[in-house]
Amino acid sequence: MDSTDKAFLLLADGSFFEGQAIGARGKTIGETVFTTGMTGYTETLTDPSYYGQIVTQTFPLIGNYGIIKEDFESRKSWVKGYIVRELCEMPSNFRCQSSLETFLKEEGIIGIAGIDTRALTKKLRNSGVMNGMIISGREIDQFTKDGPQKYLEIIKSYKIQNALQAVQSRAVDGGTVLEARGTDPSHSSQFTGGQTPNSLGTDPAAPKNKNFHVALLDFGAKANIQRELEKRGCKVTLLPYNTKAHTILELTPDGIMLSNGPGDPAENTDVIEEIKQICEWNKEQMKSLPEKAIAIFGICLGHQILALARGAKTSKLKYGHRGGNHPVKESESGRVYITSQNHGYAVENQNLPAFARQSFVNLNDGTCEGLIYTDIPAFSVQFHPEACGGPHDTNFLFDNFLKLMENKNASK
């Protein structure tokens, strides 16, 4: 990293930061957010939920263990830009395959280091997330010539669009089934550093080797969701985000997983309508043939889309929840869990439908972190129980999903 290679960060409110260029050179625009994770930057960079965003790492030193491809959450990086206080140039880790700087260049990610990330984080916390632009390389001369006003107009007009379509794990084919995978005993150890499922928090009492069939709707699914299901013996069919309700039901899965993903959940009206149809079908089955009902589990964006399909509302948070240290309380037991989170929207917990019960609440701001639906076999959480590079406190929710599927199968 050349200390003389300048980079600028310009925010929509006119705030200006000068630092050192990292990664690729050029200019990039996105929604500027911050994450409080001390580790897990590989997972952050490859998490599709960060699509369209410039990510600020609040921890002052990033990159000290390098890049490990086995820890990727998807096939590539999705961030629009990357901001760190200090980038480690000499990583040390027996699993390290490249430096963070090398990865950023290979992925074409434009970044900036050496700025006061604490001041930037305070600004975003007090004013809310805002659009920004990172400028480096040859673009510096053009910026100096034109002045910031021209760029501010572009920055303010930026909006994340077509997010779900952009982050598909594989090519979308009009709602066609993309992939079906079963359990590979070597698959779990490959992606968990050789740890056994129990060492990652799997409930020993949870049903195992049941070969449950789970339809995973890919809204930008993190790889660890599929890994957690597969290591519990599930056969996973990965489906495009726009798969029709009738196509999903024709697969006769034991369970439906609604994945994480980027963007404003309320904009996905077509997807919400398909999930609504599945829930209505489930509701009818519960009246006449409850053994045919399908268990549903939603995570993050999946939690929000399920809530919208059931009549709840969502709203944008001032600066979101991003990082691996967010405390949530389970409503029934009062127990507190530390969770990994990455979202800018939340389900409004006022005026929830009568059949929706809040199961978890955020202890920092009181927002809804989970819902249980009493009229159909469905539940969802706002946080990430599958988190790697984060806490495993709520990993048991995957076991709860298996138990829900087993309860449905026991009555057949």
Residue ranges and their predicted role:
Residues 8-9, 327-329, 370:
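Residue-level detector of beta-strand face positions
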Residues 110, 213, 295-297, 313, ...:
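Proline-centered loop/turn at the N-terminus of a beta-strand
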Residues 213-218, 339-340, 379-383:
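Active-site-proximal beta-strand elements of phosphoester/diester hydrolases
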Residues 257:
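N-terminal Rossmann-like NAD(P) cofactor-binding module of classical short-chain dehydrogenase/reductase
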Residues 260-349, 388-406:
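Cysteine-nucleophile active-site neighborhood
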Residues 335-376, 412:
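Catalytic beta-strand/loop cores that center a nucleophilic Ser/Cys/Thr
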